[in-house]
Amino acid sequence: MTGFKQHKGIAVPLDSANVDTDAIIPKQFLQKVNRIGFGKHLFHDWRFLDDAGQQPNPEFVLNQPRYAGASILLARENFGCGSSREHAPWALADYGFKTLIASSFADIFYGNAINNGLVPVRLKEEEVDLLFQLVATQPGIEIEVDLEANQVRAGELSFGFEIDEFRRYCLLNGLDAIGLTLQHEATISAFEAKQPSWI
């Protein structure tokens, strides 16, 4: 997992509350456990007019040329609700998103996102409103998420955000559960070496 310190990129506004994980990655695409390849199915039922994914929906925001290459998803409250599928953050990351900004996230989704190196930023609802207004009036404007300073910046706007210090440490250093364990490999090995061989 790659560490995250700062990221600046185009923000795409998904102006919907309570976006659930079935909308993020529909159930028919969950057959595999490899994290790669889910991006093409992200928001499938909204992005495409057909089941095969061959006819893009021109009305859906991710299909609009002005948001091409967006790496920040701006969303509304309770993003990632519904079932706890880890495929949802996989799909968002595989599509190219580095960070998500919303006023709230579903708890399980929030943890899954962090565990997969995707940075979910919680701002006050009125701050999210201001970002939506900015992106609407200046399509293609870049937003900067600075995890080292716990700041979101865009144009003249600047907002602080809070994140659990342990989770922040993991994101800054690119550590998932395996990476954290490997940091203590020498200590674990020394402990195991002291144990009787018959245990």
Curated annotation (Swiss-Prot):
Organism domain of life: Bacteria
Cellular component aspect of the GO annotation: 3-isopropylmalate dehydratase complex
An annotated GO BP: L-leucine biosynthetic process
Top EC category: lyase
Keyword Amino-acid biosynthesis among record annotations: yes
SUPFAM superfamilies in the record: LeuD/IlvD-like
Pathway connected to this protein: Amino-acid biosynthesis; L-leucine biosynthesis; L-leucine from 3-methyl-2-oxobutanoate: step 2/4
Keyword vocabulary terms for this entry: Amino-acid biosynthesis, Branched-chain amino acid biosynthesis, Leucine biosynthesis, Lyase
Enzyme Commission number(s): 4.2.1.33
Pfam family, one: Aconitase_C
Swiss-Prot/TrEMBL catalytic activity: (2R,3S)-3-isopropylmalate = (2S)-2-isopropylmalate
GO molecular function: 3-isopropylmalate dehydratase activity
Listed InterPro entries: 3-IsopropMal_deHydase_ssu, Aconitase/3IPM_dehydase_swvl, AconitaseA/IPMdHydase_ssu_swvl, IPMI_Swivel, LeuD
UniProt-listed HAMAP family: LeuD_type1
Biological function: Catalyzes the isomerization between 2-isopropylmalate and 3-isopropylmalate, via the formation of 2-isopropylmaleate.
Quaternary structure, from the entry: Heterodimer of LeuC and LeuD.
Homology family: Belongs to the LeuD family. LeuD type 1 subfamily.
Name this polypeptide is given: 3-isopropylmalate dehydratase small subunit
Taxon lineage: Bacteria, Pseudomonadati, Pseudomonadota, Gammaproteobacteria, Aeromonadales
